[in-house]
Every structure is written in C-alpha cells, then in structure tokens.
Amino acid sequence: EKNRDLGTALYYGLYMDTNQFSELSNPVDMDMCESLNFDKNQISLFRNSNISLRELEIAGVAMLRCNYNDDYQFAVIHSQPCDPNVLGLISDFLLQVAGVNTCVVYNEDSGGYKFSVRSCIREVNASELSDYLSEGIGSGGGHYEKAGGYISMKLYEEKYPTLHSEASVSYTHLR
C-alpha cells in the first residue's frame, strides 16, 4: 500500500511537472512513469481537483478585467491575491484566446507583485520577458513559453518613484 501511495504521488508529480506529460522527454522519467504502481482513481481525482471554488471566482473575476493591446496581441490581467498556480492557470487560459499571443497576469501581496508570463510566439521568450520585467527590482525566469517572477514593491517604488505616485493617484481617483 505504501509503495502504491508513493507511486501515485510520483506519477502525479511527474504529470504536473511535465504539463500532463506533453513535455515528457527524459528517458529516465519515461521509464519511471511506465514502471510506477499507482492508483488510477486517485490520479483522476487529482487531475480534476486543481482549484477551489474561491480560486475559480478569483480567476473568473480577473478574466473579466482583461486589458488587451490589439497592435501587439498582448494582454495583461490584474488578479486578486491568490496562489501562484492560479496566476499560471489564468495565463494558460488567456493564451488560448484568439489574438492573444503574449500575456502577463499579476497580483499584489504584502511585499510586492507576483506575476505569470506566457507566450506562444517565437518573437517573445516568456523567460526573457519575465527577467526584463523584474530586472533590478525582483526576480524572474522560467521557460520559453511559460515563466513567472516576483517584483519587490519597495524596490519598484525606489526605481520608479514617479510611475508609482502617478499610479497611486490614478487609482485613488478611480475609487
């Protein structure tokens, strides 16, 4: 039973880490996947239980407030605070919209901004965009199509004091 539980955990971890096995290319990972003893019912349950009802609401509200630039086929969404995986879920969904080739989804926490970047065009490397957005004010990185990062609010305000104060004034007037 312990080996089956461990096999189930390893199988599901590999499933999630390889984008549902679509990015499974390492022969060792492939061999492990084929040799694991796992609970298929548990895997099915895990696959279909990825977010809570609250996270669904956060994602839905965020997607209603999408900012889109038609010239660059680029979208930006500001989300309520949530797990970084939900930011990725929103980004993945947004990239499925016709005409959206690159997107950034972000939210604020007590010390800064978490963000998720997606791109499906060769002209925009998600990891490079993530690095660019956080350069000198946080950290970012990932893969060619999917990346993420964090921006320190303190470092952002120090580097861009005018932008921050203008944004704060604009935001205050909107309320």
Model-derived segments and spans:
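A short glycine/serine-rich beta->alpha loop
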Residues: 19, 137-138
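Glycine-rich, small/acidic residue-mixed loop/short-helix segments
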Residues: 141
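Short amphipathic beta-strand starts and helix->beta connectors
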Residues: 98-102, 130-137
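Nucleotide-binding motor/catalytic cores of P-loop/tubulin-like NTPases across gene-expression machines
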Residues: 111-132
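A structured phosphate/pyrophosphate-recognition subdomain
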Residues: 1-113, 118, 145-146, 150-168, ...
